[in-house]
């Protein structure tokens, strides 16, 4: 072993000691480092993953769609490491770090993590880690630093090509620190060196704590890379290795993670390398679709719009445009929780979350633009994603005073959204580029999910509402243009709060998941949010899958949009003929007196004949003068031309104040009755019956054998079709039912049935195929190792009773076996009822579907 020496030249200057050359090196603070020799390796996920490695899908089976790894690992490429370096055999410990910063001792044991000397240090951000490296470099006169991402994976693999340096799976004692579906929040022992070292003598490369790397995060590039150092700039620094409390999937050698550099938490630490930083040129980030061709337009161009004195309505226009079967960086499965803003150049910018599972680590934020004069939203592109962190709830705001766009986002510590921080960034070029994200609420805690609108109060304070820690809404405010933030103190009843300031200076908030006397609450504060008084509105409360929108218009009125209760009663309006009638679904309202009364109310529809549209994730709904979307998260903005732009979880509507204040016409048609449907699934390119819609983005295709194949790698992927009101018999014929290897875990499997969200008191009628029977219990999970090869199901609905009877036959049998007793329901179905065929983690061939009206 070569000792660290300080050599003094004849001129009296001090130069660094020479690099060691032995296999191991013990430095001045007792840290042992092992020598990593030059070489090359294949970087990225190399093997197909087995079911024992895949992450769990919220108790519903596994993510089979991730069997080839995350999308950011799939560009496998050769990396050459041309120079030797030393890497610490363990992660930096509390004892070692506190030689540099003794005050860190106060953080030991916080949240139940890392209290002992020999546990990995946590609650250190990227800047803390690099500062430690500089301190140690000055102390030893040697160059210590963080490893590059390529060096880290090269050293972790230690010449292996398997999922882990142990092989295709992790073995004991690694499994002691793995939590299936884990959140990374349960206290754990972080003592270093408790698991076996890899072939090169490095410990804890799979689990214990995540480790900061030198690189800015970015996409892999093609071709051979020599000593890569990542990107010149990004929003995130790379972390590697995974942590305690994680699924095995996130501990793989190839798995990439990242974090905002200022992040401090209980699952992230670091290890050091000794050696000169490679002199490779960092890469430049490619422009994403939403960043391209962003032009400047004059205010005169932007303010031109429809005649404000004539009613104007447009929609629905789909803004979620993602290709079928997409598994990253955008996902076709689940798209929800949007935000919308008009950019200074007149572009409309939408941002929403995109994922398989809203609790998953893959959940990212996507974006799309609608350029002035265009009739179609652009293809979605990745907008914001902290790698392998759930990035929930975007909020957008344009600050007219400072001509600046704001973007707020919740960033989880891992999966789920229960422990999050609140990040903010800004743009001065219509969202083409953004400032580095900054943690404005930096402590990981419950809630932190921002909602809209973001407002500036009369005294200049910026206010944003977030879901609080106790199932309520908190306000966070800034008096210094977003530099520092504080919570005024009160927690408001209900979540997803919309906040405005009314003319007398009070804050006015409306929320979800709360009710007063069976109505949505209004909460009012006259002290800047320190306390609130709540009263009942005259609108119905809303629940899961629904979010209201609230906005103070440029002309001073309050705009409100929400939904009638799913499966409940509607609200009443008076149309242009003087007829008072019930409407159900998405509606908008206008108040001229700060929310005391809402004299103008309209169903958000074009008032035309009944037609099928898609709502959240592609679920079918009948839009008419009586019905509109039944659920979704809403966001609203008003553009400079006066138009109000309202979006749900899938669609964009625009209308003006005059339309909202004009009484709707009488319906042009009567509720549509059920019609015959015969679908053979012969293809080869189109369905026999128009009106089938994808639900949650399956991979579906006509297979050339007279069938339509649905392939699913996640949960509830399939197709649906509007049936409409009336008595009918429905027959489903399914063949070649196949479950992916993870089908041995409980999952919904094949799900068939009907859903009518706009019929009061009418439940969803779904059945699930088990090995030798059907099951109709809500949310049933079946563990199928050998599903039936085929199934035929007949649903008989009688609207006069009203009731359902369900018959089935498996493996070629006729559908003569009745499933339990008839299902009696409260009310008849509506024109919005839809038939569903869904698959979770597997594939099924649809052979025939038929609807016969019964008179």
Mark where each language-model region is.
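Short, structured beta-strand segments at or near domain termini in extracellular proteins/domains
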Residues: 265-280
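Extracellular glycan-recognition regions
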Residues: 669-855
